[in-house]
Amino acid sequence: MIYKTKLGEIDIRDEDILYFNEGIPGFTHLRKFALIPIQNQPIQWLTSIEDPFVALPVVDPWLVCIDYSLTLTDEDIQDLDIKDKNDVGILSILTIPKGCPEKTTINLLAPIVINLKNRKAKQIIQENSSYSVKHLVKDEIERSQSLLKKSKTGSE
């Protein structure tokens, strides 16, 4: 089916629609979204198919923060009807300031968790976490590269 989105008219199959039973904080009235990839880029757009003006850039958090960790509560697992950890997809929302892409931040505190089997999704706000909603992507990548260098040096 063709949907009007912030990215233009896009053909989205019903089986590709993500269902947020509670919406997303700030957009609780919106329940149906689709992931629109950007060719040759790790960033995708989490696009509302109910409001053509809502699209959020998202990325796999481990591409930015190699030691990222997430613990799902029993309630989260039940809400998303997760049966197997291999059926889970995790994405983090990016904030890209207009005209200043070098100041892009990533929300590591509240990732989007997707059950890849049934397409249920939820933004999880981690409790008792050292993460925040705004980590500078540039800094996290540099920190991750430093961790990689240390692990290579230590294993030689």
From Swiss-Prot:
GO terms, biological process: bacterial-type flagellum assembly; regulation of translation
Keywords, comma-separated and alphabetical: Bacterial flagellum biogenesis, Chaperone, Cytoplasm, Translation regulation
Entry superkingdom: Bacteria
UniProt keyword annotation of Transcription present: no
Transmembrane segments: none
UniProt record similarity statement: Belongs to the FliW family.
Function recorded in the entry: Acts as an anti-CsrA protein, binds CsrA and prevents it from repressing translation of its target genes, one of which is flagellin. Binds to flagellin and participates in the assembly of the flagellum.
Protein name: Flagellar assembly factor FliW
Gene name of this polypeptide: fliW
